Amino acid sequence: MGCNCTKGTRPDNDNVDNSNSIVSNVNVKERRSKPKKTPKKKKKSKSASSSKDNNVGFEERSNDNKEASLTLLIPIDAKKDDESEKKVNLERKSSRLVFQRRPTGIEVGANNIGTLQQPKMTRICSVSNGERGAQVMAGWPSWLASVAGEAINGWIPRKADSFEKLEKIGQGTYSSVYKARDLETNQLVALKKVRFANMDPDSVRFMAREIIILRRLDHPNVMKLEGLITSRVSGSMYLIFEYMEHDLAGLASTPGINFSEAQIKCYMKQLLHGLEHCHSRGVLHRDIKGSNLLLDHNNNLKIGDFGLANFYQGHQKQPLTSRVVTLWYRPPELLLGSTDYGVTVDLWSTGCILAELFTGKPIMPGRTEVEQLHKIFKLCGSPSEEYWKISKLPHATIFKPQQPYKRCVAETFKSLPSSALALVEVLLAVEPDARGTTASALESEFFTTSPLASDPSSLPKYQPRKEIDVKAQEEEAKRKKDTSSKQNDSKQVSRESKAVPAPDSNAESLTSIQKRQGQHNQVSNSDKFNPGEDAASFRIEPLKSGTAKDGHTRYGVSSVNRNGENVMMGSSRSPRKELRTQRSFVQRGTAQLSRFSNSVAARDGSHFAIANPRWFEDSYNNNNGRQNGGAWSQRLVVKHKEFTKHKESITVNGEKKERMHCSGPLVSAGGNLDEMLKEHERQIQLAVRKARVDKKTNRGDNRQTQAFLAANGR
């Protein structure tokens, strides 16, 4: 029997137990703790062997406080008995007897001899806190590690400066997708940016669920999450995916691209295989649509965007939200408010995709939930009475039709191949249980009859095409169409304005003016101005709205109505009578302006102003004609005489698109406009001074009146 005895400082964590040892600590008095063979001198050790077992060892340690620790190592002969290895640690701490279990630092060799090693560092905090600390040290932000530690466990974040962002290729409800280049591998990737408002824990958990689901899935037809980009100080996160050149919606809507039956079978087969993998892992995608089905240059299809995905358990029903799946691909049970559903919601969306690939357009494009449900009932029929009773859907009483709808899927898609039509009939069943599973769909005649599904690599190669590209082109085409429409309307108005009476006409009837009121919604109500006539013209941006209400014009250009819109005036000429509304500008011998020029009556639709032009004239003079006794009229007439000497037109025609000509002040071009503004400012100052003088005069008169009344005793 060997005995090792050493004296010194007592360690705290020396003795740990493993599965083959028992640790017992007993505190006894010094004179009882020392074995007989232990030497009396300090810092000295010797070994002894037992005739019965040479593999038993003692170890004793003591410190300056005369406390000793004796360790007895007793290995087990596995052939003779089944007892576990025991280790007794005797420590002198006090007279109290203490038993405890500790982790061990003993490493058992091949010969079953226990040798004491340096104790390993152990975590003294909880597992979650320890993992959180390790994740923060690895570079993850604390707000993410504290809420979504499971999602990032075992990963190290990538740095944003290791990627080069190229362009935006997608926009979703909760995120944006960018095309980027990985500078470390020089490969193209897709970065899905998720930003959190105020680090809301719920939104972080929502994003973490997507990451956990993506890490659980591993299939060739499912997008693989390759990494995450974030930092300790970042408020957003990027999910790194493989870059895919196309999505199914972009290709299907491209003019000139028609899918063959074998090609459609190839895409649908890959889609169903990917869904089968998701459903076998207990995952519902809940947003199957063309833009989420991505294709690479070899026509390999992968399901993407698991932002709305969730876990489900088939045998344990759990309430789920019904506000999922894009409206055009949403099944009727979700529109009716069901919270107890399963894989059949993805199968309904798959049926919509199948029919869309054959027809080339969405089959049920509803704008609202009510309209979408109505389209479903018209195409697929309404559920049976038994289904209404058994399902107990929340919105059943609201949306249940009084008369049942007849199913007409076969009549609507009669041009489809019979095998495809049969599969569409199954997948678009109104009652969820009749839709089958992904496995049953893959075993249907659609995939087993000729022509068989093509190999993805044998399909045609296309230019990169995504749904966002299609939308951008549609918006551009719509903008061009609107622009051309505006130009055509402007030309039509210009042709109509040539029928306006000549300047020597005596008057224009009230009926004619009222007829013209209906044109106030046109882009322009002005004629092309004749450069030989006595008026100026400015190039002005077109009206955003053709209707101007409550607008008052000053100085013949424009004014701002109560809604903040500029009200532009016309530039065609009209008879002399209508110029009674503009006496402060020109004298009667001057050429007349348009019946629309400086007149709000025809713009705001005020019949009172048209029938009573004197009322408008008096109103205008009361508001604007009091400044300095008509000095404005005299100055503008002088400028007008100077302007008539010029034979060349100062009309700026420019490009016709989105431009219009409106009458302006009767002044010549150049610096005279600045002089007019200065004169305007001077008149304002004079008016303010006059008002002050009048106010002081009125105060003096009031004081004299009061003094007079007081003197008379009144």
From Swiss-Prot:
Residues at the active site: 287
Lipidation (N-myristoyl glycine): 2
Biased composition (Polar residues): 506-528, 556-573
Record InterPro entries: CDK, Kinase-like_dom_sf, Prot_kinase_dom, Protein_kinase_ATP_BS, Ser/Thr_kinase_AS
Region of interest: Disordered: 1-64, 471-579, 693-714
Keywords associated with the record: ATP-binding, Kinase, Lipoprotein, Myristate, Nucleotide-binding, Serine/threonine-protein kinase, Transferase
Tagged with keyword Nucleotide-binding: yes
Composition skew (Basic residues), residue ranges: 31-46
Binding-site positions, ATP: 169-177, 192
GO MF annotations in UniProt: ATP binding; protein serine/threonine kinase activity
SMART domains: S_TKc
Chain ranges of the Protein kinase domain: 163-447
Composition-biased stretches (Basic and acidic residues): 471-498
Compositionally biased spans, kind Low complexity: 16-27
Annotated CDD domains: STKc_CDK9_like (cd07840)
Record bears the keyword Cell membrane: no
Domain of life: Eukaryota
Pfam family, one: Pkinase
SUPFAM superfamilies named among the record's database cross-references: Protein kinase-like (PK-like) (SSF56112)
EC number of this enzyme: 2.7.11.-
Similarity field: Belongs to the protein kinase superfamily. Ser/Thr protein kinase family.
Protein name: Probable serine/threonine-protein kinase At1g09600
Species for this entry: Arabidopsis thaliana
Taxonomic lineage of the native organism: Eukaryota, Viridiplantae, Streptophyta, Embryophyta, Tracheophyta
